[in-house]
Amino acid sequence: MIRVICDNETFELPTGSTAADFASKIKNSHYFAGVVINDQIKDLSTTLSEGDVLKFVTFTDPEGREIFLHTSAHMLAQAVLRLWPQAIPTIGPVIDLGFYYDFANLSISEDDFPAIENMVEQIAKERFEISKKTFNDKQEALQEFASNPFKVELIQEFPEDENITCYSQGEFMDLCRGPHLPSTAPVKAFKLLRTSAAYWRGDPSRESLVRIYGVSFPTTKELKEHLHQLEEAKKRDHRVLGTKLDLFSQQECSAGMPFFHPRGMIIWDALIGYWKRLHQLAGYKEILTPQLVNRSLWEVSGHWSNYKENMYTLKIDEEDYAIKPMNCPGCMLYYKTRLHSYKEFPLRIAEIGHVHRYEISGALSGLMRVRAFHQDDAHVFLTPEQVEEETLNILNLVSELYSTFGLEYHLELSTRPEKATIGSDELWDLATAALERALINSNTPFVINPGDGAFYGPKIDIHVKDAIQRTWQCGTIQLDMFLPERFELEYTNAQGEKSTPIMLHRALFGSIERFLGILIEHFKGRFPLWLSPEHVRLITVADRHQPRAQELATAWQQLGFVVTVDDSNESVSKKIRNAQNMQVNYMVTLGDREIEENTLAVRTRDNRVLNNMTIDTFINTILEEKNSLSLTPLL
């Protein structure tokens, strides 16, 4: 007999029992997709050992969802091979909103999707058992996949001493690390989304492939809800709205580096202005460090040896330089410009730095995935005893910032990875416990990701939920025990001795470009007044009203409003439609009556008409709306 632990209870099982054997004794076990054993995700067919700690996962768990989607990708490949036997499967990973599979020697269109979907449905009905096979010898694996040059290439890259695994279901077998569902039966709702061209390993010099994207769910109801969400997401696509609202553009000559237009810069400046005010009140000092730095800095930071392939490098006077991919090393140099005492800790240093990181062209997407972006970093230098309190301060700052935009969020605490190389066990335990206590005291729900921290410290990730319930990883709070040591940072402690500070590295927006993309989609382009690129548009009824419109525009601009005048020859109704299409918050129509009575005819973005409004009432109300950072109109 062996003893295992599940849900904090100990169970005795016969020696040789699998996770599936144990699961069969649990109610609703047919929903289980896999099992986490000692913090490692595994197949349900895994044999259990004495002392194992188990957690069964379903589709609603991130691990379970990944298993479900990964199996669905294999079912897609199996269906394609049944319909087009000459196709050559390459890889089929899980992605954020589903999965894809790449094929060589295949030509299809979306007209073929119904046939593939029907075949996947048939494979699910056949209820194939999914089994794992391990090759202890690389040559055996090469022989098994000899007819597929893509699999052969992958197998050849495996270390000689590493086991190679594959999974089979019916007549289909694929090279894969797993884990997978026990059978094909649970995949009851399957939908193909689109197809595109791709290159093997993302390299344009390699073989051209056909990529098929799909998504799957345990029930038709969940699939319908997801497809509805995708339709809503299309309406909110920041790339479409960014063009329609004249906020930004993409140019072929500078892929992944967006061009912000004047209207987009108004939103940008409002975001940055809010961020600066928030941080000044929280005791942060702002710096600005160079973008182009000598190789020597990146060698000290470790980027040159570990991150060089993601950096843009060049030579100046025969010396190697790199455009910074991160702000952290520059802040380390700033810290070293003078001596420090524990009395000035926590020392909060902030920087909105322009960073550049290489991304393959196929991964670029609007403002969400770029090569150049601004990151709102801050580095807080402190003593070990201050970690908990300062983390709580940062969490309170997170709460204030995201609530300002009406964004819900959840937090994830990632703990020490198995191969952590920096810091003692004691320091890791103290640091992790401090972050966890701060999370508890913040009264914000959080989950723990065991072993998912960086090698230099535990971290808290901030996941934002938008208006259509999608989640985005934005900010992070990272405890860094690495860089202060690498850069030989020091401070004088209370005993008058030299010590190395602990550093909290945190970003709230994360990438400001990405956060702006999220906001465009969250608000559907209908920004609250304080963020809006155009607060008021004055609409003249006739040419004779233009001087008064310009007079009001000038006066209101001096109060800090973004005001434009439409004195074109279009009809008033057309001018109003144009303003509404550009999501202007307030439209003010000026005709003879308004000028004679010194009043305003105000129309809101939601088409509410407010006639005979006094100028003072209008201005005072929208001033309050703007200055209070209100998310809803006050008129």
Curated annotation (Swiss-Prot):
Chain ranges of the TGS domain: 1-58
PROSITE patterns assigned: AA_TRNA_LIGASE_II, TGS
UniProt lineage: Bacteria, Pseudomonadati, Chlamydiota, Chlamydiia, Chlamydiales
Record's subcellular location: Cytoplasm
Entry GO CC: cytoplasm
TM spans (from-to): none
Top-level taxonomic group: Bacteria
Enzyme class: ligase
InterPro entries named in the record: aa-tRNA-synt_IIb, aa-tRNA-synth_II, aa-tRNA-synth_II/BPL/LPL, Anticodon-bd, Anticodon-bd_dom_sf, Beta-grasp_dom_sf, TGS, TGS-like
Alphabetical UniProt keywords: Aminoacyl-tRNA synthetase, ATP-binding, Cytoplasm, Ligase, Metal-binding, Nucleotide-binding, Protein biosynthesis, RNA-binding, tRNA-binding, Zinc
Cofactor binding summary note: Binds 1 zinc ion per subunit.
Keyword Protein biosynthesis: yes
Name of the molecule in the record: Threonine--tRNA ligase
Gene Ontology annotations of biological process type: threonyl-tRNA aminoacylation
